[in-house]
Curated annotation (Swiss-Prot):
L-glutamate binds at residues 130-132, 166, 303-307, 321. Transmembrane segments: none annotated. PROSITE patterns: AA_TRNA_LIGASE_I. A motif ('HIGH' region) lies at residues 135-144. This is Probable glutamate--tRNA ligase, cytoplasmic. One of its GO terms (biological process) is glutamyl-tRNA aminoacylation.
């Protein structure tokens, strides 16, 4: 469940005519649900089960609310169903609410079937869809579902995806981020799109606004923002609502020239409509800034006014957008009808992508950048397309995971571990293997029976995928082990040197609890199956120094995590310098998978760090 959904449930709870004990229990229940882990889900369920076991009088309002909370979150519902036999009291409440709500569930199910049929029909003719980001920042994972739903529909129906930059806010400098968004799309493999800007249609949008004024369907208003907010909430008509059209038109023209401060233009729809988006929305607002691409005006259209008009003009046939905009669909249709626009797109709503512990707010990201807490929009700790790419996300895995979620209206919170698990499956066969040793307190290892000069041996870069090519491994009489491996080996122990064979520890030198040297002799005829410890190593001669960076959570308890970036130095086998530039993922054996961000700088891919067992 997304946190915003939980907050809505809190608001509902606060409005219900129920006792304070009910309200306190439900809020405590939601505290656990918001944390989105199986442990907290179980805690939440046990809390309610205990509450209902204390001979609490049944309340149908509470039962319905709890039923809605449990059913609104697929992951939570799964946990509940797996535990329902021991949640005896809660099960009684749930089943009671389930039986009472059966008619509504059937109706919802029927609507869902209709929606599936509508979506099936979408593919029968070429669809024209659009992706309309505001170029005020780079694309992040939150944009990705909207992008892919629109892209996939266009692809599957042999249609067209339009890219429209929503540049209606003159205060913002859009040019920089337009280039960044095109770069993001290229990274995702989405290219060759027809590009337009909302500002391309500013003159036409002015004409449409004038048309609404002349039809007595729009009026200028100088009500202050706070009063307007209250009036819209309470359904109170503005004092300016019935201004005559000629006066409204005169002031609107002054507004466009920056000579009517404090005014805006509102659509005259229906202030008593239960859908608040229909309560005379603002469609033009003043600005003291000139637009970068259009120097004619000092008042600019709102997103809700632009979309239906430009969608219709550009030939969009299906508007695919998150269901958080669903209330605005009625408003969208009102503009199409009252402006007599011929092309009327259909709607395909889907649930917003919700991710746990993820900063997606542009305002928050800008603040982190300005405070120098992150390096920019492509910082690997940010969930931007470039950020997660630098963290080791393969775009195939990312797109596949998002596509698996489909265009459903069901709200789920996505756990990063699931995305990274899919990513590992993609990068594993594509990743060359290299041995690496952490530099700090590394152990020098001397082979007492090494014969002759150092030599190289050619082996596959990835034994599971020999098509990646091969590498030369350097064998010499002096090796480097990690302190961790040096510490665990005992004198006279036989162990296995990876990619070489068995060896026996002859002597172990320890100073101040730190292993400094090992003396070993090769025993290559030994059986590697009989050894407990398989040790990765690097020849001291020719070892390359590389930086490995491990990134953690950006925020902890809403505060910046000062430990969100940890640098380590490694000695890596010399053949890594011959790595092809198109091989961006590697595995440091027994350490984890890494993304090559720049020469000899590697970022640890999340959830691939290997736990050592001895």
């Amino acid at each position: 469940m997304a946190v915003e959904n939980a907050i809505n449930f809190r608001e509902i709870c606060s409005l219900l005519d129920i006792s304070e004990s009910y309200k306190c229990t439900i809020n405590a229940f939601l505290d656990n649900v918001e944390k989105c882990t199986d442990k907290h889900y179980n805690d939440a369920l046990n809390l309610l089960d205990t509450f209902f076991s204390n001979e609490v009088k049944s309340n149908s309002l509470v039962n319905d609310l709890i039923f809605c909370i449990i059913n609104s979150n697929f992951d939570f519902l799964k946990v509940f169903k797996s535990n329902k036999l021991r949640l005896e009291n809660l099960q009684i409440v749930y089943e009671s609410a389930f039986n009472e709500n059966k008619p509504f569930l059937k109706e919802f199910s029927a609507k869902d079937k209709i929606n599936k049929e509508v979506k099936k029909n979408l593919y029968s003719t070429p669809a024209v869809t659009r992706f309309a980001p505001e170029p005020s920042g780079c694309l992040h994972i939150g944009h990705l579902k909207a992008l892919l739903v629109n892209y996939n529909l266009a692809e599957k129906s042999n249609g067209t995806l339009l890219l429209r930059f929503d540049d209606t806010n003159p205060v913002k400098n859009y040019e920089k981020y337009e280039k960044e968004i095109l770069r993001d799309l290229d990274t995702l493999g989405i290219t060759g799109l027809k590009i337009s800007h909302s500002s391309d249609y500013f003159e036409l949008l002015v004409d449409e606004a004038v048309s609404l004024i002349n039809k007595n369907l729009a009026y200028v208003d100088n009500t202050d923002q706070e009063t307007m907010r209250i009036e819209r909430f309470e359904g109170i008509e503005s004092k300016m609502r019935n201004i005559n059209n000629s006066e409204s038109l005169k002031i609107f023209k002054e507004l466009l020239q920056g000579r009517a401060p404090g005014y805006c233009l509102r659509a005259k729809i229906d202030m008593s409509n239960p859908n608040k988006s229909m309560r005379d929305p603002v469609i033009y607002r003043a600005s003291d800034k000139m637009h970068g691409r259009c120097k004619l005006y000092k008042a600019f259209p709102t997103y809700d006014f632009v979309c239906p008009i430009v969608d219709s003009i550009e030939g969009v046939t299906v508007v695919c957008r998150a269901n958080e905009y669903k209330d605005r669909n009625e408003q969208y249709k009102w503009f199409l009808e009252n402006l007599e626009l011929e092309n009327k797109p259909e709607f395909n709503d889907f649930s917003k992508l919700n991710l746990e512990d993820t900063v997606l707010s542009k305002r928050k990201i800008d603040k982190l950048i300005s405070d120098s807490l992150v390096t920019g929009w492509d910082d690997p700790r940010l969930a931007t397309i470039q950020g997660i790419k630098r963290l080791g996300m393969h775009m195939t895995a990312l797109k596949d995971y998002i596509n698996l979620q489909g265009a459903s209206n069901k709200t789920n919170v996505i756990s990063w571990d699931k995305i990274w698990a899919m990513n590992k499956k993609v990068i594993d066969p594509l990743s060359p293997r290299f041995m690496a040793v952490e530099k700090i307190n590394c152990v020098r290892v001397f082979i007492t029976n090494f014969e002759g000069l150092k030599y190289t041996k050619n082996i596959p870069l990835n034994k599971k995928n020999t098509s990646l090519g091969s590498k030369d491994v350097l064998f010499s009489d002096t090796l480097l082990f990690s302190q961790e491996d040096g510490f665990v080996l005992k004198e006279n122990e036989e162990f296995t040197l990876m990619n070489w064979g068995n060896a026996i520890v002859e002597k172990k030198v320890v100073e101040n609890s730190i292993v400094t040297e090992l003396y070993i002799k090769l025993h290559l005829e030994g059986d590697y199956k009989s050894t407990t410890n398989k040790i990765s190593w690097v020849s001291e001669s020719g070892a390359v120094t590389a930086t490995g960076i491990e990134y953690g959570k950006l925020l902890v308890n809403e505060e910046f995590n000062i430990n969100s970036k940890i640098d380590k130095q490694y000695y890596v086998e010399s053949s890594i310098t011959n790595l092809s530039t198109d091989m961006k993922h590697v595995q440091f054996e027994r350490i984890g998978f890494f993304y090559c961000d720049s020469p000899c700088v590697f970022h640890l891919v999340p959830f691939t760090k290997q736990k050592r067992t001895y």
